């Protein structure tokens, strides 16, 4: 991958990523790598990496603002056929979590040929979110359920948020088992906590007792 080539303008931040993962330290290192860039293609690539990193870190509002700024400048048309769809999938997810459905749907519809360009799991996640945002919750759950054992990020948040639209509190409780992984991840942690509260409020008295005993 270009991110890890020795000649890559992102080699310094790539080293931080390899050592620390998608942390604030990586985000700051990436910002420093982007600053001196002159070529639009390199800037587009760097900003796409940055937006994705911000989303993974749960800094969703910041990521969306950055996307909106550079999208208005048509910067991302410089991205290659793999990076551009992945960026759009992640931004759609960020808007979905922030309940900015109109923004997510605008990307899905206006850039539909790019969003649906591949058959990746992230594309399937975007398709499911589109179904959910249009009230077709059963369709969304069907698609997301098939992604639960995949490497696609954030599927548990997406499916729990969707299952709760169907008032399936017990199922949502089961699907939220790994929400602890979002601890320290800003807006993602806040969303996980909000969903857990909604789940608990909807459980039967017996299920609530069971959940408390399990420390959920």
For the regions a language model picked out, list residue spans one by one.
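Alpha-helical repeat scaffolds
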Residues: 26-33, 60-73, 101-113, 137-148, ...
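"A position-specific structural signal for the A-helix of alpha-solenoid helical repeats
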Residues: 12, 49, 90, 126, ...
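Flexible helix-coil transition and linker loops at the boundaries of alpha-helical arrays
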Residues: 33-43, 72-82, 112-120
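Eukaryotic alpha-helical solenoid repeat scaffolds
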Residues: 21, 153-216
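Alpha-helical segment of the N-proximal tetratricopeptide repeat
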Residues: 8-32, 36, 49-56
């Amino acid at each position: 991958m270009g991110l890890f080539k020795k000649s890559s303008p992102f080699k310094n931040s790539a080293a931080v990523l390899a050592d620390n993962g998608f942390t604030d330290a990586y985000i700051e290192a990436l910002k420093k790598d982007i600053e001196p860039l002159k070529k639009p293609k390199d800037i587009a690539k760097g900003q796409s990496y940055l937006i994705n990193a911000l989303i993974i870190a749960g800094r969703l509002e910041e990521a969306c603002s950055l996307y909106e700024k550079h999208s208005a400048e048509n910067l991302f048309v410089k991205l290659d056929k793999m990076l551009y769809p992945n960026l759009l999938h992640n931004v759609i997810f960020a808007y979905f979590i922030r309940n900015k459905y109109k923004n997510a749907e605008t990307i899905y519809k206006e850039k539909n040929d790019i969003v649906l360009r591949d058959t990746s799991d992230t594309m399937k996640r975007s398709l499911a979110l589109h179904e959910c945002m249009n009230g077709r919750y059963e369709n969304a759950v069907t698609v997301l359920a098939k992604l639960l054992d995949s490497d696609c990020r954030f599927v548990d948040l997406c499916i729990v948020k969707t299952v709760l639209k169907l008032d399936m509190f017990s199922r949502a409780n089961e699907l939220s088992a790994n929400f602890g992984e979002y601890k320290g991840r800003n807006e993602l942690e806040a969303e996980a906590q909000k969903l857990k509260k909604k789940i608990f409020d909807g459980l039967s008295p017996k299920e609530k007792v069971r959940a408390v005993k399990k420390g959920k």
